[in-house]
Amino acid sequence: VPTTGKIFFEGKDVNEIGLEAHRRNNVAFIFQNYNLIDYMTPAENVMLTSKKPPIPELIKVGLTEEEAKRNVLKLSGGQQQRVAIARALASEAPVVLADEPTGNLDEDTAKEITVLLKDSAHVLGKCVVVVTHSTEIAKQADVVFRLTHGQLLTLEEAEKARQVESVE
């Protein structure tokens, strides 16, 4: 494991621009525990990361316009997860890091969110990294990294990734 060196993103040394600035400008997160601003509405949470109108972004992930205007604490866990997903996908960041993004969603909604994540990569050109234990989600990946106890076990390209039996 490297302990020294430099990290470059789009040709720029991340340390020179600052880690905080790099994260703010280049990386959007979908946290497993949502990390929403709890005194705001879903629409206000999305507006934190995007100049796009928030309601259409929230509708894309399955919320109604009425739900988009409620306080986030009045939403179910699955609805809060959708807000976190909308917030990340609406951002201008070229990288999306998603920790179990479909963990609290029903099967149909999880499939819809997976399509949105894939479209973000294939249509919008974002780098989408998903951490998951779901075999079904892993099968949708272009590349699968299998980790065990923090160590890289295997790296599988698109076709082999679709044949994944189980994810540990």
PLM regions: where:
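Conserved ABC transporter NBD signature motif
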Residues: 4-13
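ABC ATPase NBD coupling module
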Residues: 14-28
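Conserved ABC ATPase "signature" region
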Residues: 53-67
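Conserved ABC ATPase signature
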Residues: 71-75, 79-81
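Hydrophobic anchor residue at the start of the ABC signature
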Residues: 85
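Conserved catalytic motifs of ABC-family nucleotide-binding domains
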Residues: 92
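Catalytic Walker B motif of ABC-type/P-loop ATPase nucleotide-binding domains
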Residues: 96-99
